[in-house]
A protein has these predicted regions:
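C-terminal output/effector regions of signal-responsive regulators
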Residues: 136-217
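Short hydrophobic/Thr-rich beta-strand motif most characteristic of the beta2 strand and flanking loop
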Residues: 29-41
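A general structural motif
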Residues: 1-3, 54-55, 88
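Conserved acidic segment of CheY-like receiver
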Residues: 2-24
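A short acidic (Asp/Glu
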Residues: 16-20, 45-46, 68-71, 102-106
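Conserved phosphotransfer microenvironments
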Residues: 42-52, 56-83
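His-Asp phosphorelay/catalytic-motif detector in bacterial-type signaling
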Residues: 81-91
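Output/docking surface of receiver
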Residues: 10-12, 35-36, 70, 92-168, ...
Length: 217
């Protein structure tokens, strides 16, 4: 049963087919729906296309312009653009042994050597398992954030820390799921309004205490 939809990006058709064969061969439980695309020349155009397709993970070759000089970005730049739109999104960059992606990349944990996929016999953690685990970890973080957000929404009263956390969770969910409005605008307004009423009540109580002291005199 399909559980994960993933994308592989490479400018070379034979490499795209190679990756598709790798997933097909190693997907023992048939959980992966795998697509492979040639990158567009312009990053923004390609980014819009792939982010609208709701992939669970994106894997890309590093040197995307090696066989097609019209492509204006490499795999690391593609991943960087993806992560700006979807924080913590599962991304992987595949490189050759003589590649400089590890040196150039900010996060070495997303960079893997292509050769690992052809020599995995006896390995405890195949690359396909790394993809699966990253997706599961990402989904778990989002679900945990949603549960915490729902618990905050159900509270009758939110203090300043609760409100700050609520907005933090809302922003996180928006940037990981591409849901632009996680909390209805009116609920956010009510939350702010409750803080305003709290300030008014505190001010009124302070004024009442001052009046009482004056009356005693």
């Amino acid at each position: 049963m399909i559980q994960y939809k993933i994308l592989y990006v490479d400018e070379v058709e034979s490499e795209r087919n190679r990756f598709l064969r790798y997933i097909h061969k190693n997907d023992d439980e048939k959980e992966f729906l795998t697509e492979a695309l040639e990158p567009d020349a312009e990053l923004e155009k390609f980014l819009e296309k792939i982010l609208n397709d709701n992939y669970d993970a994106i894997i890309t070759d590093h040197k995307l312009s090696e066989a097609n000089p019209l492509i204006q970005y490499d795999g690391l730049e593609l991943v960087e653009a993806i992560l700006k739109s979807r924080i913590d999104f599962p991304c992987f960059v595949l490189t050759s042994f003589d590649d400089d992606a590890v040196r150039d990349g900010d996060d070495v944990n997303i960079v893997y050597i292509k050769g690992l996929m052809t020599n995995e016999e006896g390995h405890l953690a195949k690359f396909i398992y790394k993809i699966k685990n990253q997706i599961k970890h990402h989904r778990k973080k989002i679900e945990k954030a949603k549960i915490e957000l729902e618990e905050l929404i159900k509270k009758e009263y939110l203090d300043a820390l609760d409100e700050a956390r609520l907005l933090e969770l809302d922003t996180y969910i928006e940037k990981t799921t591409n849901v632009k409005i996680s909390i209805p605008p009116q609920l956010k307004s009510l939350s702010n309004l409750s803080e305003l009423h709290k300030m008014i009540d505190n001010t009124e109580q302070l004024l009442a205490n001052i009046r009482e002291k004056k009356d005693v005199k």
